[in-house]
């Protein structure tokens, strides 16, 4: 049988029993071992063919000659990839898969919550509420509707599509970019290649960064992009802090070149008390909670079930990382 190692550093006590039930349903085809990183026995490492983990330390990886699949449970795997992860000592390739899609519902609702807050002044009313101030006149020229606006979603993957679907329900026009614009991409009115990314920026009232962080996507949004904004534009980052140039975004929003910013991810987390983000003008900050939802492990279990079924049937696995990125 194939040996599966769950690197469980206290994520969720239900995770082990849930994965156990999934593995048992394959009638002995797979065997599950669950250990914390520090406690994995040598013989288990040598047998392991599939790893389920948040990250796989290189020290453990080197002791796994038979690895076939690494299944991360995060959608972003920046900082978790290294050359020897992809190839065994005998030259055999290893599949690396992400948790893409697990977070789609929560991340997309998170972005919509920020958008709606700006459109309807919820954050302004909240401040006024705490100050016991009736702020109707102050808000009068700041409110608008999402309906009729154009949203540009940079990264039209599973999270990007979930955002687009919800934006369309609000009557917004959806434009996206992705590496392969020929791929079928539901919920988008227009899909552009990353080369046409500045066309998206010019067309958008709201811009959402929903990409993984790779060497190609780092500092994707900065001074140059802020300079070409043609209208009051709101910018949201649900991906990673490294996708944009924080210094220029802060300067842009504080000087009014960017209408408002919604941000869930930062270069430094937790955000230190003296960070300029806390005092940025018209900015909504959330503490990297976009992916948080109570069904998280259930969704991860469903992904593992799909992967094991594919392996059992000799079909390709999903969510695979392209090692050339």
Q: Model segments located where?
A:
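N-terminal glycine-/charge-rich "phosphate-binding" loop or analogous flexible N-terminal tail
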Residues: 1-48
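Phosphate/diphosphate ligand-binding glycine-rich loop within oxidoreductases
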Residues: 47-129
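Glycine-rich, N-terminal phosphate-binding loop of Rossmann-like dinucleotide-binding domains
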Residues: 55, 74, 209-211, 238-239, ...
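Glycine-rich NAD(P)-binding loop of Rossmann-like domains
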Residues: 93-95, 125-162, 190
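Rossmann-like dinucleotide-binding domain for NAD(H)/NADP(H)
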Residues: 96, 232-234, 238-325
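Oxidoreductase and adenylate-handling cofactor-binding alpha/beta cores
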Residues: 108-124, 168-172, 302-315
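Conserved beta-strand positions in the Rossmann-like core of class I SAM-dependent methyltransferases
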Residues: 175
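Rossmann-like adenosine-cofactor binding region
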Residues: 179-276
């Amino acid at each position: 049988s194939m040996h599966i190692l769950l690197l469980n550093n206290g994520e969720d006590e239900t995770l082990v029993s849930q994965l156990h039930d999934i593995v048992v349903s394959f009638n002995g085809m797979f065997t599950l071992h669950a250990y914390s990183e520090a406690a994995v026995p040598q013989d288990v490492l040598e047998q392991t063919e599939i790893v389920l983990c948040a990250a796989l330390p290189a020290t453990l990886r080197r002791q796994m000659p038979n690895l076939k699949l690494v299944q991360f449970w995060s959608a972003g795997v920046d900082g978790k990839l290294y050359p020897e992860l992809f190839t065994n000592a005998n030259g055999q390739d290893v599949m690396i898969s992400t948790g893409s899609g697990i977070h789609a519902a929560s991340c997309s609702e998170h972005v919509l919550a920020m958008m709606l807050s700006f459109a309807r002044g919820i954050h302004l009313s909240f401040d006024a509420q705490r100050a016991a101030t009736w702020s109707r006149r102050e808000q009068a020229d700041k409110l608008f509707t999402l309906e009729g606006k154009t949203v540009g979603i940079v990264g039209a993957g599973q999270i990007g599509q979930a955002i687009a679907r919800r934006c369309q329900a609000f009557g917004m026009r959806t434009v996206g970019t992705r590496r392969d614009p020929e791929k079928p991409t539901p919920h988008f009115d227009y899909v552009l290649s990353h080369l046409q990314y500045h066309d998206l920026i010019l067309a958008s009232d709201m811009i959402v960064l929903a990409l993984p962080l790779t060497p190609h996507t780092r500092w994707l949004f900065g001074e140059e992009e802020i300079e070409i904004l043609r209208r009051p534009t709101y910018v949201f980052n649900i991906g990673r802090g490294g996708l944009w140039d924080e210094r220029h975004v802060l300067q842009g929003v504080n000087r009014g070149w960017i209408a408002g910013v919604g941000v869930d991810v930062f270069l430094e987390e937790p955000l230190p008390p003296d960070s300029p983000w806390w005092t940025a003008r018209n900015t909504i900050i959330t503490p990297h909670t976009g992916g948080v939802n109570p069904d998280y492990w259930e969704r991860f279990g469903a992904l593992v079930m799909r992967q094991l079924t594919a392996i059992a049937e000799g079909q390709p696995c999903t969510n695979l990382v392209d090692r050339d990125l």
